[in-house]
Every structure is written in C-alpha cells, then in structure tokens.
Regions:
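A structural signal for small-residue-enriched, beta-sheet-centric alpha/beta enzyme cores
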Residues: 162-189, 218-330
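Short Gly/Ser/Thr- and charged-rich N-terminal loops/segments
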Residues: 198, 205-213
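Leucine-biased recognition of intrinsically disordered, low-complexity hydrophobic segments
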Residues: 19, 193, 204-206
C-alpha cells in the first residue's frame, strides 16, 4: 500500500515534522506547533513544526509593540469529515503573540465522520496571547468538533475569540449542518475559586443530557464552555438564536489586573452593545475567575465584525494601552 509523507520546516531553530499515514484512512492528520520566546523588545518564534494541511508562515510585526502576529494557514480551503488537525503553542515569559487566520474556517459536508480540531495553548508568566481566528462556517450536512484548552501562568492574559456562522448565509443555507460540538477550557493560576462553569453561560439552549460527554470535571479556577448543536435531529438545541446568523464568545482572562479594571471594561463593552440595537444582541459578565466573558449574536457578518472590532479595541486599550491592529487580510 502506498504511503504518503508531509513535511514542513520552521524559521529560527530548524525542525522537521513528518506525518505518515495510509491513504486508505479517512481524512488528514495535521499538526501545527509553535514555541515563542522574548528576545529584547520582540517576541520571536524559536521553534515550529507543521504537517499537512497546515502551512507555516513566520510571524510578522505590524507595529512597535513587539507582538508576534502569527497566521494559521490551511491552504486546502477547509476541513472535511475525518480530518483531525491540531494546534499547539507555548508562550514563554513576557511574550506577546496574536494568532489568527487569513479567512474563514470552512467545514464541508460529511456522511459520517466529524472534522476535528484540537487546540492547546500554554501561556507563560506575564505573557499575552490573543487567539482571534476568523469565523467557522459549517456547511450543510457537516460535522465539526472543536476543543480549545488554555493554561495560564501567573500574570498571563488570554483574549480568546470564537465565532460560528449558521451556515453559508449568502446561499440561504442556515442551521443546516449535521452537528457542531465545542469545548473551551481556560485554566488559570488562581486557586481556591469555585468552579466557574456555572458563571459562563452556554450560548445555545441544550436538551438535557445532550452536552458533549468528553469534558472532564471543571478544575478550580477554570472557565469552561461546552455546547452541542444538532439542528436537524434536535431543533431545540439551537434554541432562541435560530433567528440569528452568527454566534460568538469572547473570553478575556488573566490575573495581571485588578477587579476595578474588569468592572470598567464590563461597562465599556455593555455600552458598545447599546449602540447597536437590533443588529447585535449581547451581554458581558465578570467571572469567579479573574476576567470576563462576552456572548453575542449578530444578524450579518458586517454587524459581527464591527461589534467585535469595537470590543477588541476597548479590551486592548484598557489592558495594555494598545490600539486594535490592522491585520491586513486580503
């Protein structure tokens, strides 16, 4: 039987990752790994590896903040059933990394197997991570399962944005995917806090007993969101957001600032929602863990983008006195 191999190498420390699989297996097994360190005034990529369908691009520097702007590139155009892709990143002390994608994450129709994406992010002491990919678009009949796990060291901060479309809205394809399962878990260095899963509202109504079974008990000092959507078989799983086309979550978590900063940011974000009645509907809450969570639904992609960019700008200014960057997507 023929075998196939994918290779990729990094800038910085040379590293080659080889992926070997039987062609008879369904889907691709792709891994993307990054390691960042602070050197002088900049964050630099010191080690990386990737395997198909991921493609490696070195970070860019769009301003003088020293932030390493890192693009997650899948040139194949999306995920199909049976794909299992992963992203792992380690940020050492005092680094600042922004990870994004050049276009939407498309998930294509599948007859049986889901497309799976697993993300594991480790943020070192006093480091900053912004995980801000473009929206996920599940096509009609698609199956998608995603998990994002973040570990925060003392003084670390994460901005985590996760948005999903109801489908290919321009083609009048709405809530026609087979299933979407999502799990986000952010573990902080704080101890002695009550489990905060109850403080983080699940974005869509779930039928009793229909939440994903893979999630472990919530550790103390953690923020967890889990949901499962099955629009065709369980229409009630979509809940009240069925009349909207975009659903998004934003988590801003970290112990580098005090409670008064989070309260001020909560008020600023609430004011942004008040300026867009009818176009978006959202809420913001502080948590048992240090930080806040934002939930929102939007009528259109432009409404989602404008609101997200306004919130992102407010968060960056309040936390770091930095403007929102121009990511120059083409």
């Amino acid at each position: 039987m023929k075998r196939k191999t994918a290779e990729c190498f990094s800038s910085g420390t040379f590293h080659v990752s080889r992926l070997t699989s039987h062609e008879s297996l369904v889907g691709r097994r792709g891994a993307l790994n990054y390691e960042f360190e602070r050197q002088g005034s900049r964050t630099v990529l010191t080690r990386s590896s990737c395997s198909s369908p991921w493609h490696h691009f070195p970070p860019s520097y769009l301003d003088d903040s020293g932030c390493a702007y890192t693009w997650l590139v899948n040139p194949s155009g999306g995920l199909v059933g049976g794909d299992h892709v992963s992203v792992e990143a380690q940020l050492h002390a005092h680094t600042h990394v922004l990870m994004t994608s050049p276009s939407a994450n498309r998930v294509y129709r599948s007859l049986s197997e889901p497309a799976v994406q697993e993300v594991r992010l480790s943020v070192g002491p006093d480091a900053r991570l912004e995980w801000v990919p473009e929206v996920t678009i599940p096509f009609a009949g698609s199956r998608f399962r995603q998990s994002i796990h973040v570990d925060l060291a003392p003084g670390a901060t994460v901005i985590l944005w996760d948005a999903i479309a109801s489908g290919r809205v321009a083609m009048r394809e709405r809530w026609a995917f087979a299933s979407v399962e999502n799990e986000i878990c952010i573990r902080t260095s704080s101890r002695g806090l009550a489990p905060s899963s109850a403080a983080v509202p699940v974005p869509l109504l779930l039928r009793r007993g229909q939440a994903p079974k893979r999630g472990a008990p919530v550790p103390s000092g953690s923020v967890v969101e889990r949901y499962r959507l099955v629009p065709g078989r369980l229409p009630e799983s979509v809940g009240l957001v069925g009349s909207w086309d975009y659903v998004a979550s934003l988590f801003v978590i970290g112990d580098a600032v005090g409670a008064e900063v989070w309260k001020g940011l909560e008020s600023a974000i609430a004011e942004i929602f008040e300026q867009r009645p009818g176009l978006v509907l959202g809420g913001v809450s502080t948590l048992a863990a240090p930080g806040l969570v934002v939930k929102l639904v939007a009528r259109s992609a432009p409404d989602l983008t404008v609101t997200w960019e306004a919130i992102w700008a407010a968060v960056r200014k309040e936390l770091w006195n930095l403007p929102a960057p121009n990511l120059r997507r083409y």
